[in-house]
């Protein structure tokens, strides 16, 4: 049996090679497929300013692991749920500003930071494509940006390796 998050450990050529297996697995379990964060959280045009890598943090002048991707919207500032789940936490964080966490499955969570405001409350159930927040400039961010992470059992994985469907959610 192929578990969908095994895809996170593959490099890009392997990801392409195993995409068919993953899609077959998801078709066999449509409930899991509805929950997994398989699309980007921004619907319209955006620029990716930082990727999942080691980055220099100008605020503390050190290289640090960047465990997500930073997206700057060029049109719509609304953040949409990339998969179904429950809002498990909304809170202020010193570095990340206003943050939101979605619990998609027992093992999979997504994290959103630097928000202007949330459009949901803790405990809310969301479906893929529902508006959940507005991109902002809270915390230590260089401007209006969304910091987005996918976590499996608490460990960050590269969100760009996990997207299966087209970026736009028309």
Specify the residue positions occupied by each region the protein language model found.
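Catalytic cores of peptidoglycan-degrading enzymes
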Residues: 43-170
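Non-catalytic extracellular/periplasmic "stalk"
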Residues: 1-47, 51
């Amino acid at each position: 049996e192929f578990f969908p998050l095994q895809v996170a450990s593959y490099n890009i050529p392997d990801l392409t090679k195993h995409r068919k297996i993953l899609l077959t697995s998801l078709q066999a379990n449509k409930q899991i497929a509805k929950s997994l964060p398989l699309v980007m959280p921004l619907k319209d045009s955006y620029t990716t300013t930082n990727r999942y890598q080691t980055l220099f943090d100008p605020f503390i002048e050190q290289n640090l692991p960047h465990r997500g991707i930073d997206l700057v919207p060029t049109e719509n500032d609304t953040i949409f749920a990339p998969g179904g789940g429950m809002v498990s936490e909304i809170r202020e964080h010193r570095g990340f500003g206003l943050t939101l966490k979605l619990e998609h499955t027992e093992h999979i969570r997504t994290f959103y930071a630097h928000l202007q405001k949330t459009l949901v409350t803790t405990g809310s159930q969301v479906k893929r494509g529902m508006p959940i927040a507005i991109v902002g400039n809270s915390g230590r961010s260089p401007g209006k940006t969304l910091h987005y992470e996918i976590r499996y059992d608490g460990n960050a994985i590269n969100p760009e390796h996990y997207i299966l469907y087209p970026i736009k959610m028309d």
